Amino acid sequence: MSDLVPLSRKPAPAAGGPAPSPAAPPRKVYVHTFGCQMNESDSDRMVELLGRHAYARAASADEADLILLNTCAVREKAEQKLLSALGRYREVKARRGALIAVSGCVAQQEKDRLLARVPYVDFVFGPDNIGRLPEMVERARDERFAETGWMDSEEYVFPRADPEAARGRVTAFVTAMKGCDNVCAFCIVPHTRGREVSRPFPDVVAECAALAGVGVREVTLIGQNVNSYTGGCTFADLLRRVAAVPGIDRIRFTTSHPHDLSDALVEVFRDEPKVMPHFHLPVQSGSDAVLRRMRRDYSVAEYLDRFDRLRAARPGIAITTDFIVGFPGETDADFEASLALLERARFEQSFSFVFSPRPHTVAAVRLGSAPEWRDVPREAAVARLERLLAAQRRIAGEILAGELGKVVEVLVEGPSDEPGERLGRTPENRVVHLAADEAAAPAGARVAVRITRAGGSSLSGTLA
């Protein structure tokens, strides 16, 4: 239940002044989102909720009456970015009287410290409290507060999305579940997102159908550990149900734990063409000793067995991953094992970072407590990360270069930043800049593209 008593529902002015009349221009909300796809989806839900209460999305904080910072707590650097951003928005508050709110995982974890350290933050709320945002804005006119309790109501855990808010988009996120029941030694997510809760599958399928009705062609099912889904069917069954929705051409999902990669899910990749050949499968380390300390519940051999079964079921599938470098006790040999795994797997992309101790996690508590938990010097960890990133850049470049001359399917998402170009993605989630105009490649169209250039992290091509 919530940490606070229910908020008053009495009629009251909106933030920053009297409630606008029906003819008055709407108040404006600016959302600064940090972190993962789940946060991006949560930010969209917040804007939709406020839109029902006479708020419109602001293009910049300078024109906002309400500034929301939706935060990430996975790494310490994300918290530092939050404090830096808050400093910039302080002037907007002084000039416009804007309310400032902090949401997301940092808010959940550090609510009291935020309110004490940053006196111009008006209210703080956790991920489970998004459904009460309009009420919290009302309350914030009168007092500062934090609302970070776990909510029992499904309406608050999974705020209903308004499909009209997605009109004009080609892709959309759809929440399938939230939370995580794993206890990885480095991860703060169970403390900030709570236990796993799966959204009933009819709700997920209905939202996908509604999105298809307004022109969305690709959906990404999201959750902290989405392939442990238990919302009335298995995750493999959920993918098949979404694939049956008319108008949905492509399906992706994130994020997954290797331990929960079932044979049934591998079969979906083999049998269902709407499920895209792209899988994010975090490994974290190539060392069994490090994986045991991380409490990842698999060995390198077990990870590679799942990896190889995916590749066999869907030849050409693009597999991406995560690495943590400099985890407590990591030796040079442990790191070399991670490099060897990267070379063996040839990941399409890896999101790699130096270990950052997070409050209340096993790794933070045990850091330095025994030889196997000794701290890795920062300089050594950074040097290892640079080697890993260099190897990944080389491999990614080789993969993209291998696409030269091929004809691939591209789902057009809209205009590119470059004049005269359109932007889209291949089934493997590779970004393609297409030399074509809107008439030849309208948003939502799937077009055949001949790849003519591979550079950086994207491809370029022409209509085939």
UniProtKB/Swiss-Prot annotation:
The gene is miaB. Binds 2 [4Fe-4S] clusters. One cluster is coordinated with 3 cysteines and an exchangeable S-adenosyl-L-methionine. Its EC number is 2.8.4.3. GO terms for cellular component: cytosol. It holds the Pfam family TRAM. [4Fe-4S] cluster 2 binds at residues 180, 184, 187. The keyword Iron-sulfur applies. The lineage of its organism: Bacteria, Pseudomonadati, Myxococcota, Myxococcia, Myxococcales. It catalyses: N(6)-dimethylallyladenosine(37) in tRNA + (sulfur carrier)-SH + AH2 + 2 S-adenosyl-L-methionine = 2-methylsulfanyl-N(6)-dimethylallyladenosine(37) in tRNA + (sulfur carrier)-H + 5'-deoxyadenosine + L-methionine + A + S-adenosyl-L-homocysteine + 2 H(+). This is tRNA-2-methylthio-N(6)-dimethylallyladenosine synthase. Residues 1-24 are annotated as: Disordered. It comes from Anaeromyxobacter sp. (strain K).
